[in-house]
């Protein structure tokens, strides 16, 4: 019994060494209550005392003595032995964990800022000190931002207002150019509105307007259907030679089958268009194919449905723009200037001085299909005649 209190006396301060057994008995009720609470919270209390290798950090002598003393204490529950386990638990929570994260106590951490010789006992104090070296970035009071333009003396309190002001000096270099008057317009919507006015002033008093519509490529895409004198687009043979030779007009019972009249017109009303051949260059085949793909416009027979072929000239006036040149679709005239082509188209109008000028003469009355009868033989030899031979 005399050797038992020697074990815990190593963990106690120097003032507790001369204490007698009576003082231990006087403190025993309080320590007993603490021991009970610790045993309720941590059930493996005796096992904690049986793990002495953690105390090898304190030194070889202290580790051997502490490791030897708790071995007999694990089986005893005396009041004097409760101080040993509590000291070991407090030692593991205070000394073991901090040694991995913090420097040993008493070591000062110097400031890493240049010119600063201060040192601090903890990392938290050092972090608070570093804030004095790195203040948050803020604009100085009274600082003004000046515009960099040469003739501008505006100043602004912040950068956001300066950037918004800079847009007034550096607008995007974008514009939409009118093809008729070469006017530069800022927005695309304004270009549409301008094309209506520009087309009305550019065209002549004639009813059919030759200038383009709203789209830039509309002259080549919309006008060819009106100038097309060929039969219905369902036939494959006009694609081979659309304008070089007159379109054939079959006679007899084959006319209703070969010309289904997709625009609601009877075959006799289509004969003026089949007989009249404009005769422009063969380079317009691409325009004809493009109009076929887009679907024939119902306005194609306009001007020639109830009128003779001579009055159908306004609907046949078209031009083609390829490789920077404008080519007339009724004659061999070509130019690189749009106004020159517009003036040339006035000659093909019915009221113009040279209305019958283009290539081949046009008949004034609906042509008789009899002269075209010999031309129907090559068409019938390509497979059309055997189909309708029983009829």
Curated annotation (Swiss-Prot):
The keyword ATP-binding does not apply. InterPro entries: ZN414, Znf-C2H2_ribbon, Znf_C2H2_type. Pfam families: zf-C2H2_8. Residues 214-226 have a biased composition (Basic and acidic residues). PROSITE patterns: ZINC_FINGER_C2H2_1, ZINC_FINGER_C2H2_2. A zinc finger (C2H2-type) spans 109-133, 145-169, 176-201, 326-348. It is found in: Nucleus. GO terms for cellular component: nucleus. Its main location: nucleus. Residues 84-93 have a biased composition (Polar residues). The keyword Transport does not apply. Residues 1-110, 201-243, 274-312, 344-391 are annotated as: Disordered. Gene3D superfamilies: Classic Zinc Finger. Keywords: DNA-binding, Metal-binding, Nucleus, Repeat, Transcription, Transcription regulation, Zinc, Zinc-finger. Residues 227-236, 353-372 have a biased composition (Pro residues). GO terms for molecular function: DNA binding; zinc ion binding. It comes from the Eukaryota. Residues 274-286 have a biased composition (Low complexity). Belongs to the krueppel C2H2-type zinc-finger protein family. May be involved in transcriptional regulation. This is Zinc finger protein 414. It comes from Bos taurus. The gene is ZNF414.
């Amino acid at each position: 019994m005399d050797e038992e209190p020697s074990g815990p006396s190593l963990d106690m301060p120097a003032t507790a060494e001369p204490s007698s057994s009576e003082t231990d008995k006087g403190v025993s009720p309080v320590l007993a209550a603490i021991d009970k609470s610790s045993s309720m919270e941590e059930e493996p209390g005796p096992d904690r005392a049986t793990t002495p290798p953690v105390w090898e950090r304190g030194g070889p002598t202290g580790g051997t003595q502490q490791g030897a003393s708790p071995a007999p204490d694990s089986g005893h529950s005396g009041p004097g032995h409760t101080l040993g386990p509590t000291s070991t638990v407090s030692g593991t929570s205070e000394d073991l964990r901090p040694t991995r994260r913090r420097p040993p106590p008493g070591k000062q951490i110097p400031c890493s800022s240049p010119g600063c010789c201060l040192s601090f006992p903890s990392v938290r104090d050092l972090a608070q000190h570093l804030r004095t070296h790195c203040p948050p970035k803020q604009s100085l009071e009274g600082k003004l931002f000046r515009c960099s333009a040469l003739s501008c003396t505006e100043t602004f309190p912040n950068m956001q207002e300066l950037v918004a002001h800079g847009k007034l000096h550096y607008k995007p270099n974008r514009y939409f150019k009118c093809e008729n008057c070469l006017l530069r317009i800022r927005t695309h919507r304004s270009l549409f509105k301008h094309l209506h006015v520009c087309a009305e002033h550019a065209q002549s008093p004639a009813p059919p307007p030759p200038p383009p519509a709203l789209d830039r490529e509309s002259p080549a895409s919309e006008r060819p259907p009106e100038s097309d004198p060929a039969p219905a687009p369902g036939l494959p043979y006009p694609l081979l030679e659309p304008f070089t030779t007159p379109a054939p007009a079959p006679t007899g019972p084959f006319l209703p089958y070969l010309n289904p009249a997709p625009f609601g017109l009877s075959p006799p009303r289509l004969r003026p268009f089949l007989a009249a051949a404009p005769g422009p260059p063969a380079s317009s085949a691409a325009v004809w194919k493009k109009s076929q793909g887009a679907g024939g416009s119902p306005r194609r027979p306009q001007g020639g449905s109830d009128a003779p072929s001579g009055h159908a000239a306004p609907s046949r006036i078209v031009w083609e723009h390829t490789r920077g040149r404008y080519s007339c679709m009724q004659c061999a005239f070509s130019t690189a200037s749009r106004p020159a082509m517009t003036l040339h188209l006035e000659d093909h109008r019915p009221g113009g001085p040279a209305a019958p000028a283009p290539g081949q003469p046009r008949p004034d009355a609906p042509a008789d299909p009899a002269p075209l009868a010999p031309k129907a033989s090559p068409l019938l030899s390509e497979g059309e005649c055997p189909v309708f031979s029983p009829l």
